């Protein structure tokens, strides 16, 4: 029996997404800005629509919640475009918020992958 083939592009994009979940990275405006496309926008789990600069400002003020993610699935939609979906649980003290998440990553003309769109949907 052979191991399933891995796609290095999909693996790379999943690793970038996981970086964005790291609390140390999330508090580093420059690190997050490097991972987000200038045209980034998000439909947040809370229902808030976030644009690039507003999200960068908000992450600097974020609480000390932990985010655990699993169930990652990545699909190459076109050359230079990847859809990533997964489940997350955000925990702060005794409160857990579950979400279904999707992100669209695009490869820029400089060859770097950046998140263009993200959506968080509340989950049971």
PLM feature spans:
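A beta-strand edge to alpha-helix "cap/lid" segment located at domain peripheries
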Residues: 2-34, 39-124
């Amino acid at each position: 029996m052979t191991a399933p083939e891995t796609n290095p592009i999909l693996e790379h994009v999943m690793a970038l997404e996981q970086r964005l979940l790291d609390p140390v990275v999330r508090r580093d405006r420059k690190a997050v800005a490097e991972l987000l496309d200038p045209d980034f926008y998000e439909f947040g789990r809370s229902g808030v629509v976030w644009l690039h600069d507003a999200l960068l400002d908000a992450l600097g003020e974020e609480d000390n919640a932990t985010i655990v993610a699993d169930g990652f699935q990545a699909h190459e939609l076109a050359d230079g475009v990847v859809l990533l979906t997964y489940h997350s649980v955000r925990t702060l003290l005794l409160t857990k918020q579950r979400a279904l998440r999707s992100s669209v990553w695009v490869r820029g003309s400089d060859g770097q992958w950046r998140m263009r769109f993200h959506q968080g949907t509340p989950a049971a």
